[in-house]
Amino acid sequence: GTLKGIPTDDEQATGLERRT
């Protein structure tokens, strides 16, 4: 996930979203 909590392509594919 990005600094703004937006999931990357990989995270969208896996359903993960890392928020800082």
From Swiss-Prot:
Question: Could you provide one GO biological process annotation from this protein's UniProt record?
Answer: oxidative phosphorylation
Its membrane topology: Peripheral membrane protein
Which keywords does the record carry? Membrane, Mitochondrion, Mitochondrion inner membrane
Per the record, the major location class is: mitochondrion
Q: Which domain of life is it from?
A: Eukaryota
Q: Looking at the record, which segments are called Disordered?
A: 1-20
Q: Pathway, according to UniProt?
A: Energy metabolism; oxidative phosphorylation
- Describe its function: Component of the cytochrome c oxidase, the last enzyme in the mitochondrial electron transport chain which drives oxidative phosphorylation. The respiratory chain contains 3 multisubunit complexes succinate dehydrogenase (complex II, CII), ubiquinol-cytochrome c oxidoreductase (cytochrome b-c1 complex, complex III, CIII) and cytochrome c oxidase (complex IV, CIV), that cooperate to transfer electrons derived from NADH and succinate to molecular oxygen, creating an electrochemical gradient over the inner membrane that drives transmembrane transport and the ATP synthase.
- Protein name per its UniProtKB record: Cytochrome c oxidase subunit 5B, mitochondrial
This protein's species is Thunnus obesus (Bigeye tuna)
